[in-house]
Design a protein with these regions (language model features):
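Second-shell loop/turn segments in exported
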Residues: 11, 34, 93-97
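The canonical Cys-X-X-Cys-His
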Residues: 21-33, 84, 106
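Acidic helix-start/capping segments at beta-turn-to-alpha-helix junctions
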Residues: 35-50
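C-terminal capping alpha-helices of c-type cytochrome domains
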Residues: 82-83, 90-117
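Polytopic transmembrane helical bundles with strong interfacial aromatic enrichment
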Residues: 1-2, 60, 114-118
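Extracytoplasmic/secreted proteins, especially bacterial periplasmic and envelope-associated proteins
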Residues: 16, 20, 43, 47, ...
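Electrostatic cytochrome c docking/interface patches
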Residues: 1-21
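Extracytoplasmic electron-transfer domains, predominantly the class I c-type cytochrome c fold
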Residues: 46-94
Length: 118
């Protein structure tokens, strides 16, 4: 597995939002994926690679401004509605499950950074 170079990042509203993003979302939505040991064992490796590739294609903060479509404006809404992070990711990455107070702060930070939200 590889991590392409970081081309550009968004202007984060705060260091806290950036830290939470990389803790909760960064493994699939950036080029700084931390590949777990089991990501080298088939068939799990295929699933993980597919999920990371799909996540990067949909929304990648390491390619900020370089993608034709960058769905940053959807990030807060998807987190609020429980669509992200996926349940199967949280099982293996308990740090991605935020307490309600931290989740509210993160949603505000995402909205301030990317726009959108409700």
């Amino acid at each position: 597995h590889t991590n392409p170079p970081v081309v550009a990042e968004p202007k984060w509203d705060s260091p806290q939002t950036k830290e939470m993003f990389y803790r909760v979302c960064g493994n699939c939505h950036s080029n700084t994926t931390t590949w777990p040991w089991y990501s080298s064992i088939a068939p799990v490796s295929w699933l993980i690679s597919h999920d990371v590739d799909e996540g990067r294609e949909h929304f990648n903060v390491s390619m900020w401004g370089a993608q034709k479509v960058n769905k940053g404006h959807d990030a807060a809404e998807e987190l609020r509605e429980g669509e992200m992070p996926p349940w199967f990711y949280v099982i293996g990455h308990p740090e991605a499950k935020l307490p309600d107070s931290e989740k509210a702060q993160f949603i505000q930070g995402l909205t301030a950074t990317f726009g959108g939200g409700k």
